[in-house]
Amino acid sequence: MQREEKQLEACLDALISQVSDIKNSLVGFIHKLENEFDRLTWPSVLDSFALLSGQLNTLNKVLKNEKTPLLRNQVIIPLLLSPDRDEEIMRLTEGRVPVFSHEVVPDHLRTKPDPDVEELEKQLSAEAARITTEAAQKQVQSMNKMCSNLLDKISKEERESELGSLRQNKQTFNPTDTNALVAAVAFGKGLSNRRPPGQGGPMAPGQTGASGMLPSAAGMQQVPMSLQSNQQQQHMAGVSMSQGNQPGKMPSSIKTNIKSASMHPYQR
């Protein structure tokens, strides 16, 4: 007798512990649904359901254990009923049952479900008994097929989502080419000094380009193109004067206007 009582006490302690864990999980899940619904994600909800499912399976294992006595064979008899408020019952029930009186005892110590629930359970049991083994096997196979198709669709969506994220994160430029382009534009690194075909050859030092710019003074004041024409006019005038001073030759009747070179923009 004492051995059975000890087993019953150990079983009740284990059941109380498991039920307490399930209650805490439910309280936490309900708190999330009520206060954090805007930040909840499906993985978090599924984790909560998985935790509850595992705890319920553990509770079923405790109930189906060989060492667990059949609780349905145990009879619970209230030893004391009082209409007054009981603080100890308040503490044990966490404030849900303040009074253990004749009015609440039938509800809290009832071992049978409500009449409506009991009637519905009988109907479901009768329908299950009418189904043959072959029909039940077909229903199970159909359900398994539907679950497999659903899992395949979920896996396909997950793979497509992963591929889409990889395409979005794929690099579409070459960092080496970008750095080389920036260095060429900013510092002229890697640029060639050769002139394009169809233009003049390399210019001598001090010679102006086609645009009238000196090579050593890029970006500075532009040199007037009239400088070269003035020098040519001076040269032609000198030739004419020398020819006129030589004996035996007729003086040239061409008049040349000699302009001063003081207009040179780079006069020292």
Curated annotation (Swiss-Prot):
Disulphide bond pairs: none
Region (Disordered): 190-268
Compositional bias per record (Polar residues), positions renumbered to this chain: 223-246
GO biological process: protein ubiquitination; regulation of transcription by RNA polymerase II
Coiled-coil ranges per UniProt: 1-26, 117-160
Main location: nucleus
GO function term, MF aspect, one: transcription coregulator activity
Alphabetized UniProt keyword annotations: Activator, Coiled coil, Nucleus, Transcription, Transcription regulation, Ubl conjugation pathway
Compartments, as annotated in UniProt: Nucleus
GO (cellular component) term, any one: mediator complex
Pathway participation: Protein modification; protein ubiquitination
Keyword Nucleus: yes
Domain of life: Eukaryota
Function as written in the Swiss-Prot or TrEMBL entry: Component of the Mediator complex, a coactivator involved in the regulated transcription of nearly all RNA polymerase II-dependent genes. Mediator functions as a bridge to convey information from gene-specific regulatory proteins to the basal RNA polymerase II transcription machinery. Mediator is recruited to promoters by direct interactions with regulatory proteins and serves as a scaffold for the assembly of a functional preinitiation complex with RNA polymerase II and the general transcription factors.
Subunit structure: Component of the Mediator complex. May be part of a multisubunit E3 ubiquitin-protein ligase complex.
Family to which the UniProt record says this protein belongs: Belongs to the Mediator complex subunit 8 family.
Name the UniProt record assigns to this protein: Mediator of RNA polymerase II transcription subunit 8-A
Originating species: Xenopus laevis
